[in-house]
Amino acid sequence: MPILCLHTAHSNAVIFEQAAAELGWPAHSIVHQVHEELLLEAEAAGGMDVALRRKTAGQLDALADPADIEAVLLTCSTLGPAVADCLSDKVWRADGMLARKVAAALQRDPQSRIALLCAAPTTYEATRDLFVQALLSGDAHLRLQLQCVEGAWALFRRGDLSGYQARMTDAAFQAYAAGAAQVVLTQVSMDGVARYWQARDSHPVPWTVAASALQALGEMRK
């Protein structure tokens, strides 16, 4: 049965298709729906409000209702909190699966530091709350550093994807230089940073939402 992804940008559908292909998923494993208006509403309101949360949750539940849909994956970090309001147990946050990966890494290596990068100001609070809640130990959040990269989202919104990728890549290198053991790209739109990563000083490839979410779903299928 297919996975249905709800996106707020057409480019995110391409990213998930690329990630699925790299993981060896069969063609047509993912069905995509794009609702740009939901993110535009959130940005106009300065973030998620109660009405938009309810609206988004209702759409997600409706998408999950058909029996032939295995799971619904919300790929927009800004809208992520709406998943908590869903009635269906088939709805997942893509960035939530990445957050659990980070929590597991911190549990394995209690001394490591992880840098979280976001770009859209409207996603900062939702991302912070998500990753802190995913941690298993009380003080693990002290080893997380969340940065909203200044100016990056404006580049994305202008359609300057090469400039956006360059800005996020520079931020990732700076995070490693500051002592991070792992950089985590918390928005799907940043996938290109990892895809074209040129390692410096053996720094690991940053973790991405799409690959982490699909890997987690693949494990759940076993």
Region spans (language model):
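Non-catalytic structural scaffold of enzyme domains
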Residues: 1-222
